[in-house]
């Protein structure tokens, strides 16, 4: 049995968690919107056409904010097409994903849906085929009280009160040659700065997110971030990161080490942000919005066979297995370990498209990745302790030395709770883990939840929705005696130990 130690001190803190770190993402792509969150005429939908079963599962996740409407989609998005009477909304070819967009679900419907889901809106503007003027008009439509053309247009559409959207993405993945309106870093930095400036003239309370690199593998990574921030540092508030991981090679150990790659990515971008700050003698700090992250590879081959120019095809519909849930758990731990700088994060996406929730005409179900996301969202709120992990390591093909144990501790001082999240990545050995918690006098173990399965490829389906579900560990798996925690984490398992006073 492997052995490891978790070291925490309640006076050594990483930082408070921003609840938006548990955000998600809905794009007009595949069946994310149509048949996912919206299906008019379905017996499962409410009077607005919103799938009630989907809404219930989204509420279970406690998603604080949802990014919309893209994604690559936003770089060709004409927001005016998506508002007003549905009979007057045009259908258009959607170039990002090669489909037909009917615009029967649009901006106002999404705001209504978000309110029912208990989420705020993170709105993206089109800086691909459009620019600052259109972004300003969209903000006027959403946030201005009245007495102007676009605010009165919103009222005419039945929305008397402003939507009051305060978080805005300045385009999407503008470094990518696949993007409509793709730009160089200097071109994008300039238009992002001017767009943010106009938007803050209109509503000084809005926050803006500039596009960072589409992934760590982009050839322009590093220089892109530096140049964009050099142009836009004073106007923007966050810089975005996007990253997906896959296991097409079937090398599980290397796949599970991907969280180390994510950690390196975040650390690198933080360094670049601070380098620009130093150069500019800046006072404010640019924080990060990791607004696309997940596992994505299962659907790649199937998507090559899709017919083009159809409506709402089965696109990017990854069926997630147990090992995917392990990595998602580790990625959430990684985000929390950077809570001092990562203030926003969005699992991409939320329903049907590389998503924790899947739907059919007859129901909705939770994929394997749903569970670490839900439980971390529920209990990973408070202050992240500077969690040191003394763990055995292994050599991964892609990321070099990787830890067998990923872990982070979150302390909610007001509620007197301490939650330990941990992933044992060893494929063949349980792990005995100790942690000195004598500073947390009076705390007792509330529960030890474990997500585990003998079959790394086990998945949840509509027919078998509970193949992979978390369970309570036996009392022998975790004990607290004299302020010292001793726990056993099973091989290839995700764990959550909750303590409270």
Regions picked out by a protein language model, each given a short descriptive name:
Residues 1-224, 229-238, 262-263, 267-304, ...:
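Non-catalytic accessory regions flanking glycosidase/transglycosidase catalytic cores in CAZymes
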Residues 242-257:
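Active-site His/acidic residue clusters
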């Amino acid at each position: 049995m492997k052995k490891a130690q978790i070291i925490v001190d309640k006076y050594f803190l990483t930082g408070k968690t921003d609840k938006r770190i548990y955000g998600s993402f809905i794009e007009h792509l595949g069946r994310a919107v149509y048949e996912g969150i919206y299906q008019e005429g379905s017996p499962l939908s409410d009077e607005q056409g919103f799938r009630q079963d989907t809404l219930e599962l989204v509420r279970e996740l406690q998603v604080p904010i949802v990014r919309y409407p893209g994604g690559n989609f936003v770089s060709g998005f004409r927001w005016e097409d998506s508002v007003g009477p549905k009979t007057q909304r045009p259908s258009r070819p959607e170039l990002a994903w090669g489909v037909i967009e009917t615009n029967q679900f649009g901006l106002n419907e999404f705001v209504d849906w978000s309110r029912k889901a208990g989420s705020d809106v993170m709105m993206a503007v089109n800086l691909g085929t459009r620019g600052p003027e259109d972004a300003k008009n969209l903000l006027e439509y959403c946030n201005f009280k009245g007495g102007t053309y676009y605010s009165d247009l919103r009222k005419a559409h039945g929305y008397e009160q402003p939507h009051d959207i305060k978080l805005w993405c300045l385009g999407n993945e503008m470094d990518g040659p696949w993007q409509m309106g793709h730009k160089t870093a200097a071109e994008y930095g300039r238009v992002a700065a001017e767009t943010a400036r106009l938007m803050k003239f209109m509503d000084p309370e809005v926050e803006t997110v500039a596009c960072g690199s589409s992934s760590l593998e982009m050839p322009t990574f590093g220089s892109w971030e530096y140049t964009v921030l050099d142009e836009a540092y004073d106007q923007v508030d966050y810089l975005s990161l996007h990253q997906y991981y896959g296991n097409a090679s079937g090398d599980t150990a290397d796949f599970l080490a991907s969280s180390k790659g994510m950690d390196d990515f975040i650390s690198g971008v933080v360094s670049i942000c601070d380098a620009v700050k130093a150069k500019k003698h800046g006072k404010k700090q640019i924080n990060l919005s990791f607004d696309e992250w997940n596992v994505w590879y299962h659907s790649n081959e199937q998507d090559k066979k899709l017919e083009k120019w159809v409506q709402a095809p089965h696109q990017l519909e990854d069926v997630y297995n147990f090992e995917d849930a392990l990595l998602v758990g580790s990625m959430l731990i990684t985000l929390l370990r950077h809570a001092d700088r990562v203030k926003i994060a969005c699992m991409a996406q939320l329903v049907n498209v590389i998503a924790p929730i899947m739907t059919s005409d007859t129901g909705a179900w939770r994929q394997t990745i749903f569970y670490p996301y839900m439980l971390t969202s529920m209990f990973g709120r408070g202050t992240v302790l500077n969690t040191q992990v003394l763990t055995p390591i292994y050599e991964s093909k892609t990321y070099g030395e990787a830890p067998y144990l990923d872990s982070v501790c979150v302390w909610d001082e007001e509620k007197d709770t301490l939650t330990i999240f941990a992933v044992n990545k060893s494929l063949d050995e349980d792990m005995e883990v100790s942690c000195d918690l004598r500073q947390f006098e009076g705390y007792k173990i509330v529960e030890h939840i474990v997500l585990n399965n003998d079959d790394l490829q086990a998945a949840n389906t509509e027919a078998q929705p509970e193949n992979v579900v978390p369970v309570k560990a036996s009392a022998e798996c975790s004990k607290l005696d004299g302020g010292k925690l001793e726990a056993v984490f099973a091989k290839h398992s995700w764990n959550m130990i909750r303590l409270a006073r």
